């Protein structure tokens, strides 16, 4: 069915006021959107930052009168409205639209990431079937791609691989399909653990091949290979811990790092690893090396 969509151009200071007012006048959903393609990276803990120029989108039943909505908003806020507009939009199958846009992707020489509902383009390739679930990694982001390509270029046969911050499990599962003996995944999010388990089952990975833990339950270990696609801040603060999780002679690959953060992250690992040249893609970097 169609919907009435109301759009307001607001500042961060106005966000809560207008969100509450829109819900008060009958909006069935309220969404914040970036108005100027302004990135927000690594916000402070316990904060939910907004862009300096934000669009607030609200959906109403199609028979709602936009002029009445605007009048009630003025009454509730006691102020003239910021820039605003209303339009009727047709309903669509958002999940199907997203699925149609998620296509198989190749990484390196052997590895394909294939949506679970899609046929693999190369039957004889290493095909990882993925249902990302709750917006965990799909391979479309440059940092995930950098890690997948790195894994494809390693000799993983017989190794134990640790995926630190496993998300969808895409890196751990890829390592297993590329020949790793076993993999360990850890994440602070219980839903990530479940997504990883589901994706492992979808790819025929035996339970004993992939162990999944919340960080507080992960056993002491030293892996042959560690991959961590998280954020620069945690990578720096956790450098002693992550370095200790790699055996001497073992391999490390890190991403989730902005280009301007690369040198700082590399410096945090330089004492313990012989580092490779930093690889840059679309403003993001990968740092890799071998444990001394």
Curated annotation (Swiss-Prot):
GO terms for biological process: methylation. Keywords: Cytoplasm, Methyltransferase, S-adenosyl-L-methionine, Transferase. One of its GO terms (cellular component) is cytosol. Methylates ribosomal protein L11. PANTHER family: ELECTRON TRANSFER FLAVOPROTEIN BETA SUBUNIT LYSINE METHYLTRANSFERASE (PTHR43648:SF1). Its EC number is 2.1.1.-. It comes from the Bacteria. InterPro entries: Ribosomal_L11_MeTrfase_PrmA, Ribosomal_PrmA_MeTrfase, SAM-dependent_MTases_sf. GO terms for molecular function: protein-lysine N-methyltransferase activity. Belongs to the methyltransferase superfamily. PrmA family. It is an enzyme of class 2 (transferase). S-adenosyl-L-methionine binds at residues 144, 165, 187, 229. It catalyses: L-lysyl-[protein] + 3 S-adenosyl-L-methionine = N(6),N(6),N(6)-trimethyl-L-lysyl-[protein] + 3 S-adenosyl-L-homocysteine + 3 H(+). NCBIfam families: prmA. This is Ribosomal protein L11 methyltransferase. Signal peptide: none annotated. The keyword Metal-binding does not apply. It is found in: Cytoplasm.
């Amino acid at each position: 069915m169609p919907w009435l969509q109301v759009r307001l151009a607001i500042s961060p200071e106005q966000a809560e006021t207008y969100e509450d007012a829109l819900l008060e006048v009958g909006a069935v959903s309220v969404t914040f959107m970036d108005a100027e393609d302004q990135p927000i990276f690594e916000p402070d803990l316990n904060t939910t930052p907004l862009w300096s120029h934000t669009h607030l989108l609200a959906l109403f039943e199609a028979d709602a009168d936009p002029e009445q909505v605007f009048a009630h908003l003025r009454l509730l806020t006691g102020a003239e409205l910021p820039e605003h507009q209303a339009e009727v939009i047709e309903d669509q199958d958002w999940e199907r639209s997203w699925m149609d846009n998620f296509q198989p992707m190749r990484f390196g020489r052997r590895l394909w990431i294939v949506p679970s509902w899609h046929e693999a383009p190369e039957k004889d390739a290493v095909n990882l079937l993925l249902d990302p679930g709750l917006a965990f990694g799909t391979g479309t982001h440059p940092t995930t791609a950098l890690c997948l390509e790195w894994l494809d270029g390693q000799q993983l046969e017989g190794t134990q691989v640790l995926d630190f911050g496993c998300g969808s499990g895409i890196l751990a599962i890829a390592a297993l399909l590329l020949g790793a003996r076993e993999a360990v995944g850890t994440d602070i999010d219980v839903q990530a653990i479940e997504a990883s388990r589901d994706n492992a089952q979808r790819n025929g990975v035996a339970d004993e091949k992939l162990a999944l833990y919340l960080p507080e339950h992960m056993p002491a270990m030293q892996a042959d290979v560690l991959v961590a696609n998280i954020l620069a801040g945690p990578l720096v603060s956790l450098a002693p811990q992550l370095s200790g999780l790699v055996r001497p002679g073992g391999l490390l690959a890190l991403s989730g790092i902005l280009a301007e953060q690369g040198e700082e992250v590399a410096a945090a690992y330089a004492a313990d690893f012989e580092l490779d040249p930093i690889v840059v893609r679309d403003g993001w970097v990968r740092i890799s090396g071998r444990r001394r």
